[in-house]
Structures are given as C-alpha cells and as structure tokens.
Amino acid sequence: MKKQRKNKINRARNLAMFLVFGGMLVMYGGLLLKQFEIIMVILMLVGFVMVLASTALYFLIGLTSTKAAVVTCPNCGKETKVLGRVDLCMHCDEPLTMDRNLEGKEFDEKYNKHSKRAPR
C-alpha cells in the first residue's frame, strides 16, 4: 500500500488540530472523573498543556507560512507554498521543487535534510 504524502504546512496544521481536540477530550475525561480529585487535576493540566502546545504550534505555523515561497503548481494551476527544497502542492499533491538540480528526480523528503558531509 502506497504511503499517503501531504504538504508540510498541512501536516503541522493537522497535528495542531489534533492537539486542540485531544486536549479538550482529555479535559472532558477529567470532568467525568471528578470524584477522583487527583486524577481530575492531572487530566485537566495535561489537557491544558495540549491546548497550549497547539496554540504555540499554530503560532509557529503562521510565522513559517509567511516566509514560505509562493509558487503556482504546474499540475492544477493553483498557488501553493513551498517549504524547503522539495514539497507537495497543497491542492493536488504534485511534487514541487525550488532546486533546479532536483528537477525530474523522484520525490523524496530526504532532500530537505541537511547532510553532515560537505557538498561536492
């Protein structure tokens, strides 16, 4: 089965949304267990920290999104943001690159990672 690929900004947004709803569910679980005060307090704090982490992540996504290069996807013709050397179109998952050396090569997330070796 082929692994589904997603745009980097959308993956971060999905994680932040999971943290918000997960935090609310954890806090709701704390309310259901209010007869056990220690467990309730722990669940409320964990849920609150999850919501705070989500807020920080949304803030970082916003900062990163403003610095991303905006390009027009050659496949669907819509504007999308590219983070790093390679990324996927937000609309049609078309592989995009800003590096001319990577044009025509198979899409791989490893192209965005910095290697410790000196470039040749």
UniProtKB/Swiss-Prot annotation:
Signal sequence residues: none
Record InterPro entries: UPF0295
Pfam families (UniProt xref): DUF2614
The keyword Secreted is assigned to this record: no
Compartment(s) of residence: Cell membrane
Membrane topology: Multi-pass membrane protein
Transmembrane annotation, as ranges: 16-36, 41-61
Keyword line: Cell membrane, Membrane, Transmembrane, Transmembrane helix
Presence of the UniProt keyword Hydrolase in the record: no
Highest taxon above the source species: Bacteria
Any one of the GO CC terms: plasma membrane
Family, as annotated: Belongs to the UPF0295 family.
Protein name, entry field: UPF0295 protein Exig_0660
